[in-house]
A protein has these predicted regions:
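Periplasmic c-type cytochrome electron-transfer domains
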Residues: 1-198
Length: 198
């Protein structure tokens, strides 16, 4: 049955593509030379001041829960079947619970430097930009530029790709759903976080 097939594929992917031999793992296993000082400072920020580990925790660096961080919305996403509006309401598509609106699953950060672009829809091209978004989601959402989107050339889709992004009421709903708090880091600290995650 389909459940067995899906579980088999998932087990294969976890076995083949999950890395637990990174410098971070070596550091945790006692090799204090595995990380540079910059990476150690980034790790300390990750688990401390930056509060990343409140959501990015466990062996996969994900709590496997759903959160709204106000990623700028573009593209059709996964709208609800009866919703004529091309928008992605996140977890609410599955639960029909308004409290899940615009919540997306916390991604695992294993090998995160290989998984750009970032955000559930690829809104940010670099680790630095998605970290900055997490630090101040309202400001970053409001300052997001259309050219950040890395979309395939599909003229027949261009008309709907930015309908949600251009809708002020929808943007206000996304921003009001944010459930993470701003954190203030300087550029040096952001670079340390990036170094740790890479």
């Amino acid at each position: 049955n389909i459940t067995h097939i899906v579980n088999s594929i998932a087990a294969f992917e976890i076995h083949e593509w999950t890395s637990f031999d990174s410098p971070f793992d070596e550091y945790l296993n006692g090799d204090k030379q595995a990380l540079t000082l910059k990476q150690i400072n980034g790790m300390n920020l990750f688990y401390g001041k930056a509060n990343c580990s409140s959501c990015h925790s466990g062996s996969l660096l994900s709590d496997q829960k759903f959160h709204s961080i106000g990623i700028p919305q573009f593209g059709p996403g996964r709208t609800r079947p009866f919703d004529p509006y091309a928008r992605d309401v996140g977890r609410m598509v599955e639960t029909d619970n308004i409290n899940d609106m615009y919540k997306f699953k916390t991604p695992a950060l294993r090998n995160v430097s290989l998984t750009a672009p970032y955000g559930h829809n690829g809104a940010y091209p670099t680790l630095k930009s998605i970290i900055k978004h997490h630090l101040n989601p309202i400001k970053m959402n409001k300052n997001w530029k259309l050219e950040y989107a890395n979309l395939p050339k599909a003229p027949w889709l261009e008309e709907i790709d930015f309908v949600t992004f251009s809708d002020k009421r929808e943007q206000d709903r996304i921003i009001s759903s944010i459930n993470i708090h701003p954190v203030e880091l300087n550029d040096k600290e952001i670079d340390q976080l990036v170094s740790f995650l890479e």
